[in-house]
Amino acid sequence: MESDCQFLVAPPQPHMYYDTAAAAVDEAQFLRQMVAAADHHAAAAGRGGGDGDGGGGGGGGGERKRRFTEEQVRSLETTFHARRAKLEPREKAELARELGLQPRQVAIWFQNKRARWRSKQIEHDYAALRAQYDALHARVESLRQEKLALADQVDELRGKLNERQDQSGSCDGGGAEGDDDDKRNSVMNASSSGLVEEDYVSCLAVPVVDVSEDGSAACGGSSYEYDHHLDYLGGGQLPDPFCGMPDLWEIWPMVEWNAVA
């Protein structure tokens, strides 16, 4: 199994005491070694994995690095999806023994897989949030445009309403004057009709004149009251519309007047 792990680079050994600069240098060296090992592993994978087939060449050429088999990859994928958490050293050792790998191979594979999975998850979350942001931004812009359009409509309707109120105010002024004239005419007509009715009632209330033999007229009282009543009716004459009709006087029998004469 030692030949299978040639592409792996061990991390630097931890020290008990070292300063910050030394730690940074060690970390940089470790990263360069990891990058070089990854490049070497990718190149070996591109050329095709597996041990050298056929009897090529004496022991001079180095053995080709072997990749994980498909069965090993499937087992590792299944374990990773079932257990996203970090595996304990004992679990790593058992899984490595089942797959025929070293525990360090399993640990590094899980570490790389977890990093790629987190990166993809972050990209997925970012894409979802970006889509939501774009949708909200478009909605806000649409609402802003709709607000401006509604404000323009409100201004237009307010102007029309003011114009209509001005027109109705001018019309109401003329109409009020007309209404006052109509009311005045109605009052005058009512007054005149009331006077006519009062005259008619007064005419009907004139007592029957009793002409005595000596030519004096009695109205149920003195002649002064009768004359005063005639003066009230208009200069001692009966109202023309109802009591002053010539036809009625011509038809009225004047027996008593003739007898007196």
UniProtKB/Swiss-Prot annotation:
Keyword line: DNA-binding, Homeobox, Nucleus, Transcription, Transcription regulation
Start and end residues of each stretch annotated as Disordered: 42-67, 160-188
DNA-binding region: 61-121
GO MF annotation terms: DNA-binding transcription factor activity, RNA polymerase II-specific; sequence-specific DNA binding
Induction: In leaves by drought stress.
PROSITE patterns to which the protein is assigned, alphabetical: HOMEOBOX_1, HOMEOBOX_2
Compartment list: Nucleus
Biased segments, Gly residues type: 46-61
Primary site of residence: nucleus
Protein origin, superkingdom: Eukaryota
Region (Leucine-zipper): 120-164
Gene Ontology CC: one annotated term: nucleus
Coiled coil (UniProt feature): none
Family: Belongs to the HD-ZIP homeobox family. Class I subfamily.
Function: Probable transcription factor.
Name of the molecule in the record: Homeobox-leucine zipper protein HOX24
Taxonomic placement: Eukaryota, Viridiplantae, Streptophyta, Embryophyta, Tracheophyta
